[in-house]
């Protein structure tokens, strides 16, 4: 197997540390062709769809993509950002903002750590970003998937891709993995602050009157729970910890699951039918927050803020509020730094003195090294 090209080894070059923030992915644009290319890569992952490959290839390429690509392209068009300082997929825009803000915070704290973001599907890809980090002299990588709740369908496949790239490297960096942070105090605090800030600006629901807070997580097939995936339990724990932080009682907040795909049973209760039922019984106000999505994306901005609102109101509901995701809010960036630094312990976070590097280079060259 041929290995990836390696940067020329340089004596006296500092070994740097990097944090690689990994998210799900996004198409490069909103055309059906671009969206179809992204969906094909995403839905071809055997960790995402556990169906025999030959049968699934036919279903995906003949039955699903021809129709779903165009429908999804229209949905992406409704949320695509086209402002001067925010252009492109919301997920990519906010992911890059998170990486930039985390880089600034770590710089201000005196840490020499490179922060980069990559997507499991689409661009910037994990292979391309990892190669760029190697060219920057990175010898230690902390892989931090932006999935607070671990699942084999998300976190594990991000790790798979990192391992695949590592297998193609001649000179491999050290590697650490963050499996989850669904109950990390810094994450729960950031969620608490985000909801609290929204309520401070827009008013809080009247829970005594029967208003509700829905905590909507991305769904997965129920079969994954039965096969040992801990995702469901992690979502429930995040919901409970956030509810307690907000001072809510069970029943005032509800944990639901969205984005069901196909006919198989997924984790329940489903978000859309729950919103419909709350509207049908005349619930005065429903606030929806998506704790499992650290950055706003198609599933939050279109599926919840648009479709969810319509579902609730058409069924008879009155006041609908979508609470934005953590995105690049200050509490979340501070929390992200806390999570990362807990896993960086023991790794050098400062560059050696230039005199030390120069001495190393001089010694190597005296032994005949070219660089």
From Swiss-Prot:
Belongs to the ferrochelatase family. Pathway: Porphyrin-containing compound metabolism; protoheme biosynthesis; protoheme from protoporphyrin-IX: step 1/1. Its EC number is 4.98.1.1. Fe cation binds at residues 218, 299. It catalyses: heme b + 2 H(+) = protoporphyrin IX + Fe(2+). GO terms for cellular component: cytoplasm. Coiled coil: none annotated. This is Ferrochelatase. PANTHER family: FERROCHELATASE (PTHR11108), FERROCHELATASE, MITOCHONDRIAL (PTHR11108:SF1). GO terms for molecular function: ferrochelatase activity; metal ion binding. Catalyzes the ferrous insertion into protoporphyrin IX. CDD domains: Ferrochelatase_C, Ferrochelatase_N. Gene3D superfamilies: 3.40.50.1400. It is found in: Cytoplasm. It comes from Ralstonia nicotianae (strain ATCC BAA-1114 / GMI1000). One of its GO terms (biological process) is heme biosynthetic process. It is an enzyme of class 4 (lyase). The keyword Phosphoprotein does not apply. Keywords: Cytoplasm, Heme biosynthesis, Iron, Lyase, Metal-binding, Porphyrin biosynthesis. Pfam families: Ferrochelatase (PF00762).
